[in-house]
Structures are given as structure tokens and as C-alpha cells.
């Protein structure tokens, strides 16, 4: 039986849909109290309705890369629940498809700010508010694209590779404070974010994977919940590939 997360409080950024929403549900199923974030108040309300967890789930609207939103979210969680034991950095953007050498500078800055620097900022706030004195667990969302290049997603993959390195560094630095930091690296998952890689082309997308299918949000969510829980109490600084065997192959075009 999975370790109980009763009395644990988690923040899941980007928790209104896809992997983030499935992660919130998995953490709730283990007994945790969860705060999800998202940019749209309507999507937050819909997600909370789907989670149907009453007072054990709240939502805070805002842009994940903005300091004011980060401060407001952590402050509300501390005020309402008294701790921040788990942080899941689930937010990521990919506004550019094409050659990395043609990546506009402003787009590159936006990607790194959201995909990498925001994760560090969320970590810092959670550490200052609670984890620095009490320990905790952080799970970052990377990508199988961090390990291999491709014709369209190279720039996105670079940010996700940086996420892996950030995970390792924070894990090393914060281990004495009993803060574990890990990451997951999914392949193509059937979410709106990755729709162009599977929607309307599901048979071909599935064929790219040795296990014969693209991923589901729950595949990733359950791994995140495991890493966040005491079941993984002696695991830190690791990145778990959740990719249906894709990284065992030489295929790169379908990495998401």
C-alpha cells in the first residue's frame, strides 16, 4: 500500500489540467492537502470541481513565473494549512518550434524564465516558508526531450535539460536540510500541451514507443506522487524517465 500523505500539504503549479491535475488527484488520493495553481480562474474552478476534495483542495490564480503570484500562493497555503511539505513544479511552456539557432532572444528568455527560473523561485519560497526548517520533497517536471535532440523541440529540450541539472544541484545542496529534490522526464503524454504529437495521429504516436502506446497523465502523476512520498525517502537528485521505453530507441521526432 502506498505511504500515506495525511497531514502533508502540497503545491502543484500548473495543476488545472493534464499531468498537473492528475498529480493533484494522486496526492489527494494518498491523503495530502493540495493547492493547485493556474492562470485562469475558470479553469481553476473547473479543476477543483473535478477533484471534488472539499477543503483539502484550493486554487490560486496567477502566472507561475511572477514573483507576486509565488508569494501570494505560498502565503495563502501557510495561512490556511500551516506547512508546505511538497512542491511539484509542473508548469512548462513551449512557444517555439524550429531550429535552435533561429530562436528569438525574447522567446528564449521567456522559456527559461518559465521552465527553469520559476521552478527555482518556487523552491526558494517553499524553503523559506517551511522546508528549510522542517524538510520536504520537491518534484520537477522535465522531459524525455532533455536527453535527445529533435528537429522541432531542441530549444524546449534545452530548458528541460537545465531542469534536470537544477534538480541535481538543489538535491545536493539541500540534503542536509532533509529536502529531497527529484524530477520526472515524460515522453509524449496524451494532454492538450502535447496534442500536436498525438491528436489525430494516435496509431503512429503509439508505434514510436516500445510499450506500444503514448502516455497518460496518470502514468506520470503516480510516479510524481511516489517521489513526493515517504516511499521514496532515500531517493534524491534523480530523474525518472516515464517514456514507454522511448529512450531505449533511436527515435527522436516524437519527443515532447
What are these regions (language model features)?
Residues 143:
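Residue(s) in the substrate-gating loop at a strand-loop-helix junction
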Amino acid at each position: 500500500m502506498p505511504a500515506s500523505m495525511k497531514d502533508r500539504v502540497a503545491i502543484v503549479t500548473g495543476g488545472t489540467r493534464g499531468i498537473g491535475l492528475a498529480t493533484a488527484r494522486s496526492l489527494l488520493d494518498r491523503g495530502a492537502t493540495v493547492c493547485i495553481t493556474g492562470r485562469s480562474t475558470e479553469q481553476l474552478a473547473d479543476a477543483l470541481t473535478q477533484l471534488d476534495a472539499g477543503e483539502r483542495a484550493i486554487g490560486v490564480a496567477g502566472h507561475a513565473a511572477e514573483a507576486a503570484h509565488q508569494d501570494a500562493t505560498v502565503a495563502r497555503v501557510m495561512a490556511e494549512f500551516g506547512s508546505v511539505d511538497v512542491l511539484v513544479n509542473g508548469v512548462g511552456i513551449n512557444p517555439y518550434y524550429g531550429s535552435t539557432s533561429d530562436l528569438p532572444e525574447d522567446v528564449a528568455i521567456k522559456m527559461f524564465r518559465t521552465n527553469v527560473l520559476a521552478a527555482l523561485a518556487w523552491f526558494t519560497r517553499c524553503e523559506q516558508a517551511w522546508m528549510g526548517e522542517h524538510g520536504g520533497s520537491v518534484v520537477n517536471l522535465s522531459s524525455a526531450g532533455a536527453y535527445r535532440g529533435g528537429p522541432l523541440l531542441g530549444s524546449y529540450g534545452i530548458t528541460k535539460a537545465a531542469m534536470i541539472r537544477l534538480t541535481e544541484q538543489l538535491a545536493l545542496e539541500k540534503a542536509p536540510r532533509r529536502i529531497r529534490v527529484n524530477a520526472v522526464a515524460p515522453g509524449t503524454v496524451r494532454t492538450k500541451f502535447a496534442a500536436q504529437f498525438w491528436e489525430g495521429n494516435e496509431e503512429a504516436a503509439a508505434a514510436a514507443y516500445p510499450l506500444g502506446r503514448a502516455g497518460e497523465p496518470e502514468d506520470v502523476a503516480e510516479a510524481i506522487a511516489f517521489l513526493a512520498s515517504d516511499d521514496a525517502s532515500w531517493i534524491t537528485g534523480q530523474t525518472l524517465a516515464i517514456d514507454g521505453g522511448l529512450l531505449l530507441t533511436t527515435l527522436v521526432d516524437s519527443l515532447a
